[in-house]
């Protein structure tokens, strides 16, 4: 057990929040290279998520958790802006709100059950097994992303 204090845990999320605000310019050149291809953007982000969980699975001290959070945050900056955009592109006319609601509901379910299921894995096995489990889920997400057929139509206009 690494015995991370509540204060240290809070620092991890503070790093995450600050990075989301200030590190956007660091990923802008990569987003430019991806030329607005949301599928590629999500692919890059998921690979970065996997890297963060791999690094963190070997954590023996708080510093490695900080490194893992920094890597994870870069993954977030690629994936999470793309998800509602794709939902909007996939939604039939008049159903955009319903699709956005589904995206938000899925995120909420993840926040509700993720810590519980992660805790079960840690209690039953160990931290490394939990991170391996998360990487397996991300491989599944990559497979789904690879078979996902992009909507090649023009983006929908949102009426004011």
PLM features: what roles do these ranges have?
Residues 14-18, 47, 70, 101-109, ...:
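Transmembrane alpha-helical cores of Major Facilitator Superfamily
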Residues 78-91:
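Intracellular juxtamembrane helix-capping segments at the cytosolic ends
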Residues 23-37, 122:
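Helix-to-loop junctions at the C-terminal end of transmembrane segments
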Residues 6, 93-103:
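Loop-to-transmembrane helix entry/capping segments in MFS-fold secondary transporters
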């Amino acid at each position: 057990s690494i015995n991370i204090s509540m204060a240290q845990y809070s620092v991890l999320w503070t790093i995450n929040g600050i990075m989301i605000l200030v590190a956007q310019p660091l990923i802008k050149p990569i987003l430019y290279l991806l030329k607005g291809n949301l599928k590629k953007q999500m692919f890059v982000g998921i690979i970065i998520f996997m890297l963060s969980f791999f690094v963190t699975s070997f954590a023996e001290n708080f510093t490695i958790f900080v490194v893992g959070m920094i890597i994870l945050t870069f993954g977030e900056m690629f994936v999470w802006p793309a998800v509602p955009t794709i939902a909007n592109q996939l939604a039939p006319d008049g159903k955009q709100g319903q699709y956005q609601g589904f995206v938000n509901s899925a995120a909420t379910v993840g926040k509700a059950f993720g810590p519980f299921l992660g805790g079960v894995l840690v209690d039953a096995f160990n931290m490394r097994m939990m991170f391996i489990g998360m990487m397996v889920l991300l491989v599944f997400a990559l497979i789904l992303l690879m078979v996902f057929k992009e909507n090649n139509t023009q983006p929908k206009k949102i009426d004011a």
